[in-house]
């Protein structure tokens, strides 16, 4: 009879050892109340500010803990990782601190800002190799490098020592408050943070409900739990790049399947709203994955009322060049941004008529593409409009139809819409 391998769970002693190991490397990040959200939800909302961590994310914890356990021979041969973001920065800094040579594979679309950050943290101890168009391409090249040169691969999440390092976030939270924590919201990507945190809370705060939060466009953990087996997704929306993975780690899946009270998904547009709200109201800058746990609160308004709630803010490595897209997605989610094909009569004054008679006093044209064609009665234009209120949409469409300007509504046509957003 074939024996089933027991599920690995991080031992409390191993996580405590990781915490000692990380002293002087990772900082003990604040656990602080967010006044605005506490008032909004009628709850005590606490942020665990891993966005203030060294390398601006929790990833240094797992990377350094894993690499510090390498043998002298493994350190001498060097390490390899594949990443387009926070894991690469954590590995790079760990290479410098431990004096280990590292090779970091990054896909070609990686923003130059992130490449420069990795260079800054790793200095002379790392080499960066740009390989392939996707993370999977970079990952395959990194694994081949390990096989041919006998180097150690530092996995971003599917590794015991990495999980134990990330679990130290949980130890800190429970040390920083004496209040009973009713809800813990934790972002889920590959599952390193969620598997580590959930194990610590199951051991030390078993009554806490642990909610894993994934982006709607990359529900790899939720899909796997529903299927009762680790399942790779065919495709994902890469927008929430710090949490968009096609397949979670095998170790991480087994732990999270047992430990998480619930896994939910949050629309990318809601995540963008949260990013903007945090910046405008609290001057907090987060990356999309860093906003996941906070974005989930709107889906638990009744459950968390009067409760003590912790949201893990996982990182702040946001690329400033993405600001326009974040604003656009937030407006679309709020039903305030709309795209149309508008039929303009080929005569003088048609545009003025559209602006004066069709648009409302608070409607704003944000996008306009039009080419006049003299051999046609009507010319089609692609028009983007920003509304003051979502209630203004139906009257706007009625005015367009009544005056023969309406051609088509593009927001619900994904094949066309993807070229605009």
Give names to the regions the model predicted.
Residues 1-421:
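PLP-dependent amino-acid enzyme catalytic core
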């Amino acid at each position: 009879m074939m024996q089933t391998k027991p599920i690995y769970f991080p031992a409390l002693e191993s996580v405590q050892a990781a915490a000692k190991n990380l002293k002087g490397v990772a900082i003990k990040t604040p656990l602080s109340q967010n006044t605005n959200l506490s008032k909004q939800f009628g709850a005590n909302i606490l942020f665990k500010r891993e966005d203030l961590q060294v390398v601006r994310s929790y990833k240094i914890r797992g990377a350094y803990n894993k690499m510090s356990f390498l043998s002298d021979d493994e350190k001498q041969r060097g390490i390899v990782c594949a990443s387009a973001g926070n894991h690469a920065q954590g590995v790079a800094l760990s290479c410098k601190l431990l004096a280990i040579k590292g090779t970091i594979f990054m896909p070609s679309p990686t923003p130059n800002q992130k490449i420069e950050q990795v260079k800054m943290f790793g200095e002379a101890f790392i080499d960066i190799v740009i390989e392939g168009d996707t993370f999977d391409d970079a990952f395959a090249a990194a694994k081949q490098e390990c096989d041919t040169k006998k180097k150690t691969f530092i996995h971003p999440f599917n590794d015991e020592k990495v999980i134990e390092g990330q679990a130290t976030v949980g130890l800190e939270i429970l040390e920083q408050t004496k209040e009973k924590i009713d809800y813990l919201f934790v972002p889920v990507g590959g599952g390193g943070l969620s598997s580590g945190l959930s194990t610590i809370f199951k051991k030390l705060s078993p009554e806490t409900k642990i909610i894993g939060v994934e982006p709607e466009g990359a529900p790899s953990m939720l899909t796997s739990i529903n299927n009762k087996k680790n399942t790779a997704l065919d495709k994902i929306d890469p927008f929430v790049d710090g949490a968009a993975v096609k397949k979670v780690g095998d170790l991480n899946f087994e732990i999270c399947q047992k430990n998480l009270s619930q896994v939910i998904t949050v629309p990318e547009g809601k995540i963008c709203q949260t990013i903007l709200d945090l910046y405008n109201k609290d001057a907090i800058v987060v990356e999309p994955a860093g906003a996941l746990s906070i974005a989930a609160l709107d889906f638990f308004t009744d459950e968390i009322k009067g409760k003590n709630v912790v949201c893990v803010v996982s990182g702040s490595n946001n690329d400033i060049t993405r600001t326009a897209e974040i604003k656009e997605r937030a407006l679309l989610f709020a039903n305030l941004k709309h795209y149309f094909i508008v039929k303009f009569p080929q005569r003088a004054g048609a545009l003025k008529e559209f602006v004066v008679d069709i648009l409302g006093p608070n409607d704003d044209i944000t996008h306009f593409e039009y080419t006049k064609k003299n051999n046609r009665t009507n010319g089609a234009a692609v028009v983007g409009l920003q509304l003051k209120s979502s209630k203004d949409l139906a009257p706007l469409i009625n005015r367009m139809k009544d005056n023969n300007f309406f051609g088509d509504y593009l927001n619900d046509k994904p094949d066309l819409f993807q070229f605009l957003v």
